[in-house]
Amino acid sequence: MRISFFLLILAVIIGYAYGYSCPKPCYGNMCCSTSPGNKYYLTDFCGSTSACGPVPSCSGALYFTADSQRFGCGKHLNLCRGSKCVKAQIYDAGPAMWVEQDAGMMIIDASPTICHVLTGGSSCGWSDKFEITATVTSLTDSRPLGPFNVTEEEKAQLFIDHEIAMAQCEAEKTCNGFDLE
């Protein structure tokens, strides 16, 4: 009886730990949903194809991300870890939903430069569990692509701007996989 109870408790704990499921799958193998609280794990990539046009070079200090299925091609994201942030442009789709399921959390795939700026490391994998926030920039944001620092008040404003930008792209059906409906 005790062993059965122990196994049941263990199964419940494992289910919660690895229970991530995408609320809105799209394109066969990706997730179009955005993360509650805008929290994601950071991974890095450097691809040979792009869902949004030209493939960015992987050499040099470039600030790009995937996740076009969530936010839209060409949009800008503010990626923050603590008070360190990077403004980046969306160039590609991804990651695959199975990667997020293995990680147990939604992921922002970003350039190796972004990984280095936000973590100090040379690579970011989902198992590193580098948690960041990702917010869509406002249409009036004139900040150039690249790193910047924020205060708590400025970070709060990034979240407000994100909600406004997401409401606009949802109304225009240019994000969250609306083109699939």
Swiss-Prot record:
Sample GO molecular function, one term? lysozyme activity
Entry PTM: Contains six disulfide bonds.
Compartment(s) of residence: Cytoplasmic vesicle lumen
What top-level branch of life does the organism fall under?
Eukaryota
Keyword vocabulary terms for this entry: Antibiotic, Antimicrobial, Bacteriolytic enzyme, Cytoplasmic vesicle, Disulfide bond, Glycosidase, Hydrolase, Signal
Entry protein name: Lysozyme B
Origin species: Dictyostelium discoideum
Record's catalysed reaction(s) = Hydrolysis of (1->4)-beta-linkages between N-acetylmuramic acid and N-acetyl-D-glucosamine residues in a peptidoglycan and between N-acetyl-D-glucosamine residues in chitodextrins
State the family named in the UniProt similarity comment for this chain: Belongs to the dictyostelium lysozyme family.
Propeptide segment residues: 139-181
Primary residence: cytoplasm
The positions making up the signal sequence are 1-19
Q: Identify the EC number(s).
A: 3.2.1.17
Any GO BP annotation? killing of cells of another organism
Its function, per the record, reads: Has antibacterial activity.
Q: Which GO terms describe its cellular component?
A: cytoplasmic vesicle; cytoplasmic vesicle lumen; vesicle lumen
